[in-house]
From Swiss-Prot:
Designated name of the protein: UDP-N-acetylmuramoylalanine--D-glutamate ligase
HAMAP family registered for this protein in UniProt: MurD
Enzyme class, UniProt record, top EC level: ligase
Family, similarity comment: Belongs to the MurCDEF family.
């Protein structure tokens, strides 16, 4: 735990006791502050009370006593409309912050020079965060991993000079962290997302920009217009900007050419790494993630040799292009995290042909219409869930398909068909382009079911990572 000593002897209001809220409350109290916490969910309030946290309805509180108001990132700050607790805080003139801001203030208070790498972007955040953490940890350095990746940031060990922090930040967390000042900040990409919470793409981009604007080194992917504009603006303001690209050959910066990762400066181009044979980092999207990780680790003082070793041993993340098994020449890949067509596109682009594609669930707007360019790579599709009839119409005569209905049936049929393919490496790919809620509690449960079905097939050799 990171006790928030920067708030010692102050009184703090907190709203939001699900997720990271209870951990945040405990860290505030451990630092010597008083707290009054609340939530709209009575069960969450009861859990907090059982954990020894002082609770009270903030609608009845005297807001003049509060030094700050700590808001859970899951609670609306601005859109579609501010939560009632936000209105009360603003009316009382009380500053509104989140758990990442508390970490930043504590770091500034006790160990301002400890390495702090923060990562954001619409897609690829978690993989990049996990990759950086893996590379650093593999060297034997003291590394703490947290934030939006799933570990509440204030449950980590307290800052000290030689302790590295690798923190994934959502737009919600950045919006509540006005002092965010990482030694290296990464902005991977920007596409429309969470606009119901931010009101417009411009607001969403402006929030993401804050993370890199106050960074010692701003590492920015420039393959979309929003990030390109941010990189240009920050460079013009005198901030150290390092550009990365998975699509463009840069005159100055880091870019990918297939599996080769290159650095260009002053008319010279050097190869700094290769992803050839690293299955956990397959595809152009992972080339961008790897470029960001390399630059961040170099800026933190790691050597290229250390970085290369970490890249090669990276196991990947579950449900994100996760290689779960192989039977003969057939590879089985779990990409259950792909809950829309935009997320499925990188998976389909990662394999040139002979894809046995398991797709379906609860369809999103547009279905798989945007994926038609990848249809020639698909040997056959196996349609599951509510989307089956809709996707069958989209595939039409372009791709052979069957309506499998269930994931278990799809795995069995796809494995048999792929095993009869004469290609050197047919791929059975679960990349559903859909939500999971028609048949599974969440994408993790869907991915687990796929993995279990694959590993239950006779003759399958389990895999994990880059082999």
């Amino acid at each position: 735990m990171i006790p928030i000593t920067a708030l010692k002897d102050k009184t703090v209001a907190l709203f939001g006791l699900g997720g990271s809220g209870i951990a945040t409350a405990k860290a505030i109290v451990a630092g010597g502050a008083r707290i009054i916490a609340w939530d709209d969910n009575p069960d969450s309030v009861a859990r907090a009370q059982s954990a020894g946290i002082a609770t009270g309805d903030l609608r009845q509180a005297d807001w003049s006593q509060f030094a700050v108001f700590v808001l859970s990132p899951g609670v609306p700050l601005t859109h579609p409309q501010p939560h009632w607790s936000v209105d009360l805080a603003r009316a009382a003139g009380v500053e509104i912050i989140g758990d990442v801001e508390l970490f930043v203030r504590e770091r500034n208070h006790i160990a301002p020079d400890c390495p702090f790498i923060a990562i954001t972007g619409t897609n690829g955040k978690s993989t990049t965060t996990a990759l950086i953490a893996h590379i650093i940890k593999a060297t034997g350095r003291d590394m703490q991993l947290g934030g939006n990746i799933g570990t509440a940031i204030l449950t980590l060990e307290p800052p000290c000079a030689d302790r590295f922090y690798v923190v994934e930040c959502s737009s919600y967390q950045i919006d509540l962290a006005p002092s965010l000042n990482p030694t290296a900040g990464i902005l991977l990409n920007l596409t429309p997302d969470h606009l119901d919470r931010h009101g417009s793409m411009e607001n969403y981009a402006a929030i993401k920009e804050r993370l890199v604007a106050a960074s010692g080194t701003a590492i920015i992917g420039i393959d979309d217009a929003y990030c390109q504009a941010i990189a240009d603006r920050l460079h013009g303001a005198g901030i150290r900007v390092v550009r990365i690209s998975k699509e463009k050959h840069l005159d100055r910066g880091y870019f990918a050419d297939g599996a080769k990762l290159l650095w260009a400066q002053d008319g010279e181009i050097d190869e700094i790494a290769s992803l050839e044979g690293i299955g956990s980092l397959r595809g152009a999207h992972n080339a961008q993630n790897a470029l960001a990780a390399i630059v961040a680790c170099l800026s933190a003082g790691l050597s290229l040799e250390e970085i290369h070793a970490g890249l090669k041993s990276f196991p990947g993340l579950a449900h994100r292009m996760e290689q779960v098994g192989r039977r003969g020449k057939v590879l089985f890949v779990n990409d259950s995290k792909a809950t829309n067509a935009e997320a499925t596109a990188p998976a389909l682009s990662s394999f040139p042909q002979n894809i046995y594609w398991i797709v379906g669930g609860v369809p999103k707007a547009g279905g798989i219409n945007s994926l038609t360019a990848f249809f020639p790579r698909v040997a056959k599709a196996y349609l599951i869930g509510e989307a089956a009839a809709q996707f069958a119409a989209t595939l039409g005569g372009a791709v052979p398909f069957e309506i499998s209905d269930t994931l278990a049936a799809a795995v069995a049929h796809a494995a048999g068909d792929a095993g009869n393919d004469a290609a050197p490496e047919p791929v059975v790919l679960l990349s559903p382009a859909c939500a999971s809620f028609d048949q599974f509690q969440n994408f993790e449960k869907r991915g687990d079911a796929f993995r279990d079905a694959v590993l239950a097939l006779p003759g399958v050799m389990p895999m994990r990572g880059g082999s």
